[in-house]
Amino acid sequence: MKIMVAMSGGVDSTMTAKFLQEAGHEVQGCYMMLHQKPGYHEENIRKVKKVGEYLGIKVHILDLQDKFNEYVYDPFVRLYKEGKTPNPCALCNKFIKLGALLDFAKVNGCEKLATGHYVQVVDGFITCAKDPSKDQSYFLAQVPKEVLKDVIFPLGDKFKKDIKELARGVKVLEEFATQAESSEICFVENTYIEVLNKHYNTNLPGNVVDKDGNIIGRHQGYMHYTIGKRRGFEVFGAHEPHFVIKINAEKNEIVVGTKDDLAQKVVELENVNLFIDEDKFECETKIRYRSPKLEAFVEVDKSSKTAKLTLNQNALGVAQGQLCVMYDGDRVIASGFIKN
């Protein structure tokens, strides 16, 4: 089978290509240029070409910067401007890695696209990886169901520690096996504020208000804050912790309250991606990547791709713009971006 492998120059994508070649497939590699972080691509392309030479496979260099800006970077900047908390990796997987790259693979005669994500596809459903510490099902939950028949994830049934150990046994991969893992947003060097500062003045002080609109303090600029944050702003004469419970971008205002004020049981979603036919169902849900799963009842409006999620217990720090993913056991059955 002809398979295109998304290659980054890291251990996971390199071992993905190696596993598939050893299984007898005709493998091609593709490195995607997605952003303009200085010096980033040169080193990665060097690594990808080195692996390509070792494996004897063709390596494509694909410039997707325009698409990346349109579907990932620009929305990232815009959502922070609107006082929301974006999830760029979910958009990148949907529109770029399993969107534009899949199209490129097909144009080049490949039957499948493979990536180094730690996730499985079982019976047409995105399913949690065998290694729970590396599971990326959350970030792939916006990928359309019809795409899943064309993609494979060879690392989904493996443990990361085993992958790194295997990589140490291959001479050309030795420098990759010991390199630090990248876990942050690829186009963010240090903090997201540095990215936003290229487009806006984020340091515009404003008022901190309570739930009733009373001015009780000052902040350094609303884009510095996300829902649930409790530091970096001043509350006059405060003796107990205050948490950001709402961001009013138009007024350059943040609303603060107690931890109890952060609690939320009803969540509204938009851009819902549904993997099942039902429009009413019970599930377990994650309101952000690192949050525990909470039981919920979901009502979906398929025509508008919106949903109402009623949790069985309070969730803390529900942030507009973040991805909410719904599970049935280990299977992803729906996802949507938090609207309210």
Swiss-Prot record:
Disulfide bonds: C92-C186
Domain of life from the UniProt record: Bacteria
Regions crossing the membrane: none
Segments for region (Interaction with tRNA): 134-136, 288-289
UniProt entry keywords in alphabetical sequence: ATP-binding, Cytoplasm, Disulfide bond, Nucleotide-binding, RNA-binding, Transferase, tRNA processing, tRNA-binding
GO MF annotation, one: tRNA binding
Residues bound to ATP: A6, M7, S8, G9, G10, V11, D12, S13, M32, G116
Compartments, record wording: Cytoplasm
EC number of the protein: 2.8.1.13
Chief location category: cytoplasm
UniProt GO BP: tRNA wobble position uridine thiolation
Annotated site, Interaction with tRNA, chain positions: H117, Q322
Pfam families documented for this protein: tRNA_Me_trans, tRNA_Me_trans_C, tRNA_Me_trans_M
Catalytic activity: S-sulfanyl-L-cysteinyl-[protein] + uridine(34) in tRNA + AH2 + ATP = 2-thiouridine(34) in tRNA + L-cysteinyl-[protein] + A + AMP + diphosphate + H(+)
Location of the active site: C92 (nucleophile), C186 (cysteine persulfide intermediate)
Enzyme class: transferase
Cellular-component GO terms for this entry: cytoplasm
Family statement: Belongs to the MnmA/TRMU family.
Function: Catalyzes the 2-thiolation of uridine at the wobble position (U34) of tRNA, leading to the formation of s(2)U34.
Annotated protein name in UniProt: tRNA-specific 2-thiouridylase MnmA
Species annotation: Campylobacter concisus (strain 13826)
